[in-house]
Amino acid sequence: MTLKASAIEKMVLFGDSLMAGYGLSNEHHLSVILEQNLKSEGHNIKVINGSVSGSTSSGGLNRVEWTLSESDIDLMILSLGANDMLRGINPDETQNNLEQIITIAQNKNIKVILAGMMAPTSHGFNYKKDFDKIYPDLSKKYNLPLIPFLLEGVALKPDLNQSDGMHPNEQGTLIISKTLQKSIKDNYLKP
């Protein structure tokens, strides 16, 4: 198979344990699966795992410059906030940190796809409402492609998650990879 030249040649997954491959062997990390899937469709795109387990949006902001110092990154898939939500961090703080990360990437001419999270109702109605609107609001403000919920089709499904019920297993990672792949193709790999 001949690999096609693409407007996207190198991308980084910038998130937390949900994208880092927590609990999975290296060959089952999301970055590896996504790169293989893109190549199987003829797209020669290097996918870098820039995700860190346990990372909050604040931690991401602290490391984004270093992560993006890798040369020639064309695209960042940003998915931070799950650990902020689990820790009850004020959604305004999370949104502010994500805005700064987006701005840093855009100032480097790096395209951004935003992959959102959703708070459970156990955090209370107001927290859920404020947290859940972070990602659509940022998508609109910065004109970013949005994956409304990174774990769509995976969350709360025991057969798609590890025994902790929070982190995707190999099968869950395949579903997330397909979700990311669709967004990349729809937004940046149009024929």
Q: Where do the language-model regions lie?
A:
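Alpha-helical cap/lid subdomain in secreted, periplasmic
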Residues: 61-191
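Acidic/histidine-rich helix-loop elements
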Residues: 23, 48-56, 85-89, 164-165
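Serine-esterase "nucleophile elbow" of acetyl-processing enzymes
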Residues: 3-53, 64-72
